[in-house]
Amino acid sequence: FIRDAEIENLLADYSRPLFLAAGLNPNTVGIALINNKSLNAFVANGQNIYFHTGLILESEDPNMVIGVIAHEIGHIIGGHLSRKASAIDEAQRPALVATILGLGSLLAGAPDVGLALITGGQHVVQRKFLSFNRAQESSADVIALRLLEDTGQSPNGIIRMMDMLADQEILSE
Protein backbone atom coordinates (compact mmCIF):
# COMPACT_ATOMS: atom_id res chain seq x y z
CA PHE A 1 0.00 0.00 0.00
CA ILE A 2 1.01 3.58 -0.52
CA ARG A 3 -0.20 6.70 1.27
CA ASP A 4 -0.58 9.96 -0.64
CA ALA A 5 -2.84 12.53 0.98
CA GLU A 6 -3.31 14.54 -2.22
CA ILE A 7 -4.40 11.56 -4.31
CA GLU A 8 -6.53 10.15 -1.49
CA ASN A 9 -8.32 13.50 -1.10
CA LEU A 10 -8.91 13.75 -4.86
CA LEU A 11 -10.33 10.23 -4.96
CA ALA A 12 -12.58 11.05 -2.00
CA ASP A 13 -13.78 14.22 -3.77
CA TYR A 14 -14.42 12.32 -7.02
CA SER A 15 -16.18 9.50 -5.15
CA ARG A 16 -18.49 11.45 -2.85
CA PRO A 17 -21.26 12.35 -5.36
CA LEU A 18 -21.16 8.81 -6.78
CA PHE A 19 -21.43 7.23 -3.32
CA LEU A 20 -24.39 9.46 -2.48
CA ALA A 21 -26.12 8.68 -5.80
CA ALA A 22 -25.61 4.98 -5.08
CA GLY A 23 -27.09 5.30 -1.61
CA LEU A 24 -23.76 4.61 0.09
CA ASN A 25 -22.41 6.50 3.06
CA PRO A 26 -19.07 8.00 1.91
CA ASN A 27 -17.68 7.45 5.42
CA THR A 28 -18.19 3.68 5.23
CA VAL A 29 -16.44 3.06 1.91
CA GLY A 30 -12.67 2.76 2.10
CA ILE A 31 -10.33 3.86 -0.66
CA ALA A 32 -6.71 2.69 -0.77
CA LEU A 33 -3.79 2.89 -3.16
CA ILE A 34 -1.64 -0.09 -4.05
CA ASN A 35 1.84 0.57 -5.41
CA ASN A 36 1.52 -1.45 -8.62
CA LYS A 37 2.06 -0.33 -12.22
CA SER A 38 -0.86 -2.28 -13.68
CA LEU A 39 -4.11 -0.68 -14.80
CA ASN A 40 -6.38 -2.13 -12.16
CA ALA A 41 -8.88 -1.30 -9.47
CA PHE A 42 -11.04 -3.69 -7.48
CA VAL A 43 -13.39 -4.06 -4.55
CA ALA A 44 -12.50 -6.34 -1.65
CA ASN A 45 -13.23 -6.84 2.02
CA GLY A 46 -16.74 -5.45 1.85
CA GLN A 47 -16.87 -1.81 0.84
CA ASN A 48 -13.21 -1.09 0.09
CA ILE A 49 -12.03 0.12 -3.30
CA TYR A 50 -8.37 -0.45 -4.14
CA PHE A 51 -6.63 1.47 -6.93
CA HIS A 52 -3.33 0.44 -8.45
CA THR A 53 -1.09 3.46 -8.88
CA GLY A 54 -0.64 2.50 -12.54
CA LEU A 55 -4.31 3.20 -13.19
CA ILE A 56 -4.02 6.66 -11.64
CA LEU A 57 -0.80 7.47 -13.51
CA GLU A 58 -2.04 6.25 -16.90
CA SER A 59 -5.43 7.97 -16.71
CA GLU A 60 -5.46 10.87 -19.14
CA ASP A 61 -7.93 12.95 -17.13
CA PRO A 62 -10.10 12.82 -13.99
CA ASN A 63 -13.12 11.51 -15.93
CA MET A 64 -11.30 8.23 -16.53
CA VAL A 65 -10.69 7.76 -12.81
CA ILE A 66 -14.25 8.84 -11.99
CA GLY A 67 -15.54 6.23 -14.45
CA VAL A 68 -13.51 3.53 -12.70
CA ILE A 69 -14.83 4.65 -9.32
CA ALA A 70 -18.39 4.43 -10.66
CA HIS A 71 -17.67 0.93 -12.03
CA GLU A 72 -16.28 -0.28 -8.69
CA ILE A 73 -19.29 1.20 -6.88
CA GLY A 74 -21.37 -0.88 -9.31
CA HIS A 75 -19.71 -3.99 -7.89
CA ILE A 76 -20.45 -2.86 -4.33
CA ILE A 77 -24.14 -2.08 -4.81
CA GLY A 78 -24.57 -5.08 -7.09
CA GLY A 79 -23.45 -7.37 -4.25
CA HIS A 80 -20.92 -8.98 -6.56
CA LEU A 81 -18.43 -10.01 -3.86
CA SER A 82 -20.93 -12.15 -1.99
CA ARG A 83 -22.28 -13.65 -5.19
CA LYS A 84 -18.80 -14.56 -6.44
CA ALA A 85 -18.17 -16.96 -3.55
CA SER A 86 -21.44 -18.81 -4.15
CA ALA A 87 -20.79 -18.87 -7.91
CA ILE A 88 -17.41 -20.51 -7.32
CA ASP A 89 -19.01 -23.13 -5.05
CA GLU A 90 -21.76 -23.77 -7.59
CA ALA A 91 -19.28 -24.09 -10.47
CA GLN A 92 -17.09 -26.54 -8.54
CA ARG A 93 -19.83 -29.12 -7.95
CA PRO A 94 -19.86 -30.51 -11.51
CA ALA A 95 -16.06 -30.54 -11.52
CA LEU A 96 -16.02 -32.57 -8.31
CA VAL A 97 -18.46 -35.08 -9.78
CA ALA A 98 -16.41 -35.28 -12.99
CA THR A 99 -13.21 -35.76 -10.98
CA ILE A 100 -14.73 -38.58 -8.93
CA LEU A 101 -16.03 -40.28 -12.07
CA GLY A 102 -12.67 -39.69 -13.75
CA LEU A 103 -10.76 -41.26 -10.87
CA GLY A 104 -13.17 -44.19 -10.96
CA SER A 105 -12.49 -44.61 -14.68
CA LEU A 106 -8.74 -44.44 -14.08
CA LEU A 107 -9.00 -47.14 -11.40
CA ALA A 108 -11.21 -49.24 -13.69
CA GLY A 109 -8.50 -49.24 -16.34
CA ALA A 110 -9.88 -46.56 -18.69
CA PRO A 111 -7.26 -43.80 -18.41
CA ASP A 112 -8.41 -41.93 -21.53
CA VAL A 113 -11.97 -41.69 -20.23
CA GLY A 114 -10.75 -40.76 -16.75
CA LEU A 115 -8.50 -37.96 -17.97
CA ALA A 116 -11.21 -36.67 -20.31
CA LEU A 117 -13.71 -36.51 -17.44
CA ILE A 118 -11.29 -34.73 -15.12
CA THR A 119 -10.15 -32.24 -17.77
CA GLY A 120 -13.70 -31.68 -19.00
CA GLY A 121 -14.92 -30.96 -15.48
CA GLN A 122 -12.20 -28.36 -14.98
CA HIS A 123 -13.06 -26.77 -18.32
CA VAL A 124 -16.72 -26.50 -17.33
CA VAL A 125 -15.73 -24.69 -14.10
CA GLN A 126 -13.57 -22.22 -16.02
CA ARG A 127 -16.30 -21.47 -18.56
CA LYS A 128 -19.00 -21.04 -15.91
CA PHE A 129 -16.82 -18.74 -13.83
CA LEU A 130 -15.73 -16.64 -16.83
CA SER A 131 -19.35 -16.29 -17.90
CA PHE A 132 -20.35 -15.24 -14.39
CA ASN A 133 -17.45 -12.76 -14.25
CA ARG A 134 -18.41 -11.20 -17.61
CA ALA A 135 -21.99 -10.78 -16.41
CA GLN A 136 -20.79 -9.03 -13.24
CA GLU A 137 -18.51 -6.71 -15.22
CA SER A 138 -21.37 -5.81 -17.58
CA SER A 139 -23.66 -5.18 -14.63
CA ALA A 140 -21.06 -2.92 -12.97
CA ASP A 141 -20.69 -1.01 -16.25
CA VAL A 142 -24.45 -0.43 -16.51
CA ILE A 143 -24.59 0.76 -12.90
CA ALA A 144 -21.57 3.01 -13.51
CA LEU A 145 -23.22 4.66 -16.50
CA ARG A 146 -26.38 5.24 -14.48
CA LEU A 147 -24.40 6.76 -11.59
CA LEU A 148 -22.49 9.04 -13.96
CA GLU A 149 -25.76 10.17 -15.53
CA ASP A 150 -27.40 10.66 -12.11
CA THR A 151 -24.51 12.89 -11.00
CA GLY A 152 -24.36 14.85 -14.27
CA GLN A 153 -20.94 13.52 -15.25
CA SER A 154 -19.70 12.50 -18.65
CA PRO A 155 -19.52 8.80 -19.55
CA ASN A 156 -16.61 9.53 -21.89
CA GLY A 157 -14.02 8.77 -19.20
CA ILE A 158 -15.26 5.26 -18.52
CA ILE A 159 -15.55 4.59 -22.26
CA ARG A 160 -11.97 5.73 -22.84
CA MET A 161 -10.78 3.66 -19.88
CA MET A 162 -12.53 0.58 -21.30
CA ASP A 163 -10.78 1.20 -24.61
CA MET A 164 -7.43 1.56 -22.83
CA LEU A 165 -7.97 -1.68 -20.91
CA ALA A 166 -9.05 -3.50 -24.08
CA ASP A 167 -5.91 -2.27 -25.87
CA GLN A 168 -3.78 -3.46 -22.95
CA GLU A 169 -5.47 -6.88 -23.06
CA ILE A 170 -4.84 -7.20 -26.80
CA LEU A 171 -1.17 -6.29 -26.36
CA SER A 172 -0.71 -8.89 -23.61
CA GLU A 173 -2.05 -11.74 -25.78
PLM regions and their residue ranges:
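Phosphoinositide system proteins, centered on phosphoinositide phosphatases
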Residues: 111-118
